[in-house]
Amino acid sequence: MLCIDSDIGWNAQDVLDMLSYDLEFVGGIYPSRQSNIFIFRPYLKEDGSLIVNDKGLFSMEYVPAGFMMLKREAIEKMIAKFPESRFEPKDKELKNVSGWALFNTEIYDGEFWGEDYVFCRKAREAGLEIWVNPLFEFTHGKFKGKLLDALSSRP
């Protein structure tokens, strides 16, 4: 499954790179549409350093859904972990169609979580690792940048 928001500017080579990584869940982090900031939460080692795999990708707790790729097996793991998310459509004409509510908003620990972050939390709970390439460059609204530059500019 490939998710790309219509207001994100991206490089086609990045999609090919994500395919070549052969990972269950991989994506990119782009600047916010309202300001040139990157919203992310990395998974860190005990010493506070980033977890980086052999491909140079960073482990993340969550990523925005505007640029991510998942294998079918990843979705199947999430469905198996959250069978209660299955639903049947109200429209009886679609009686042989069902779905799973994996992209939904919710209140988690007293805080509102948007659908992309809920999806990532569920992915993590299903045992998936979430990886991002910090070198992918995006535009979003009038802002442009890559995660690595944002990390480099942090104190």
Located regions from the model:
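Short beta-strand-to-loop acidic/aromatic patch adjacent to the donor-nucleotide binding site
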Residues: 1-9
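Short beta-strand and adjacent tight-turn residues that come in two discontinuous sequence segments
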Residues: 3, 28, 133
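Residue-level detector of anion-binding/catalytic polar loops
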Residues: 7, 24, 129-131
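Surface-exposed, flexible loop/turn segments at secondary-structure boundaries
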Residues: 9, 33-34, 138, 146
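Conserved catalytic core of nucleotide-sugar-dependent glycosyltransferases
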Residues: 11-104
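C-terminal catalytic/acceptor-binding lobe
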Residues: 82-155
